[in-house]
A protein has these predicted regions:
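Short acidic/polar inter-strand loop motif in beta-rich domains
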Residues: 180-182
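Sequence/structural segment immediately N-terminal to covalent heme-attachment motifs in c-type
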Residues: 1, 41-67, 80
Length: 183
């Protein structure tokens, strides 16, 4: 980030700036605080939450932590640094309440009758690329599709209210809150 501020981005309209090195370091430190939330005291058991994440919840089949896990859902490596305890709990109990940007669910049917649900990765006028619920990358020409239904506000993630007890939800929230990436 330091170099981008100091030198700009070649080939774009972002020029370098005349700030001193000290001012740039201060600016970088400030920008890194944006979007972060102050640590709150989670009431659950972090160790048990990690076990629930890896086991009973099956969370790692869709989410990534530290480069390991699935790719259907958001990377959770630093989720505790950017989301509050209430947001984390709501994402587990009502995942459709706040679907993260970049995770638009789509349902499609090919002209041959094949149905598929996934998360849109890219789309242009002629094609769409998705990651299906198995985690596989799929690409389609739109001319091959009989139906393409975008599902804004819908999430492939289920609600965990009937999967976990309240105590287990507390543990999982505590674990997610402990994930703060590289600090």
């Amino acid at each position: 980030m330091f170099n981008v501020i100091a030198n700009g981005i070649p080939g774009t309209e972002m020029p370098g700036h005349w700030f001193t090195d000290r001012e740039i370091r201060q600016l970088v430190a400030f920008v890194r605080t944006l979007g972060r939330v102050a640590p709150q005291k989670a009431t659950g058991d972090v160790v048990n939450g990690e076990k629930l994440y890896a086991g009973k919840g099956g969370c790692a089949s869709c989410h990534t932590i530290g480069g390991r896990g699935g790719a259907i859902g958001p990377d959770l490596s630093d989720i505790g640094a950017s989301r509050s305890l209430s947001y984390l709990r709501e994402s587990l109990t009502s995942p459709e309440a706040a679907v993260p940007d970049g995770f638009l669910e789509v349902q499609l049917v090919t002209r041959k009758g094949r149905r598929m649900t996934g998360v849109r990765l890219n789309e242009d006028t002629f094609s769409i690329q998705i990651r299906d619920l198995s985690g596989d990358f799929r690409s389609f020409f739109k001319s091959e599709l009989a139906e393409l239904n975008k599902q804004p506000g819908k999430s492939p993630m289920p609600s965990y209210t009937k999967v976990f007890t309240q105590s287990e939800l507390d543990d999982l929230v505590a674990y997610l809150d402990s994930l703060r990436g590289l600090e």
